[in-house]
């Protein structure tokens, strides 16, 4: 039944379902569709159901969209700490990277959900171990925050994310380590500070 339901079906995330799938693949597809539906309901006025429980045999680090984002990327971006916690307890990696090298923490700062919910401090508590990672363009989480400042409507959100990260990392990192990350250039040689100044 599951096979016929998803056979040759264009998935909502832009990924084509293979014509023939194993039961585990069908199970993964069904769960990820339900999970993304759950996330989408958070932006609507409809009553929010409980998030779908991942099947025991599912690979939680497998991408769920055509950009290579995993369930952890989505949960972090939506500011859903319950799902983040559930995924972590079930063995999902906090340092998973999308096709462009983006981490869940980087993904989170690109959206305002953690600002709207005031959840960034608790999210950083879980993801701070990935704060020194770079994507394939050499960009750090601070570059990603700086990139959002091209929209004036996101200034306050970006400042909130920046303050949280600086405070949390400052509590556990030596000052020179934090300074080095802030001064790190991407593949164009631009630091997060330079990008922020460009957008002012």
Segments and roles (model prediction):
Residues 60-64, 94-97, 131-134, 183-185:
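Ankyrin repeat boundary signal
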């Amino acid at each position: 039944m599951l096979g016929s339901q998803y056979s040759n079906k264009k998935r909502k995330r832009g990924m084509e379902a293979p014509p023939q799938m194993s039961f585990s693949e069908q199970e993964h597809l069904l769960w990820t569709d339900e999970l993304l539906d759950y996330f989408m309901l958070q932006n609507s006025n409809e009553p929010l159901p409980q998030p779908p429980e991942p099947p025991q045999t599912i690979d939680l680090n497998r991408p769920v969209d055509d950009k290579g984002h995993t369930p952890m990327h989505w949960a972090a971006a939506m500011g859903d700490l319950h799902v983040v916690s559930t995924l972590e307890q079930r063995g999902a990696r906090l340092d998973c990277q999308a096709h462009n090298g983006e981490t869940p923490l980087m993904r989170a700062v690109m959206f305002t959900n953690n600002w709207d919910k005031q959840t960034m401090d608790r999210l950083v508590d879980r993801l701070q171990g990935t704060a020194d990672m770079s994507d394939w363009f050499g960009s750090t989480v601070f570059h990603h925050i700086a990139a959002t400042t091209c929209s004036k409507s996101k200034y306050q959100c970006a400042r909130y994310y920046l303050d949280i990260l600086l405070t949390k990392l400052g509590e556990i990192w030596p000052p020179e380590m934090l300074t080095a990350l802030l001064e790190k250039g991407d593949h164009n040689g631009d630091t997060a500070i330079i990008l922020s100044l460009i957008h002012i």
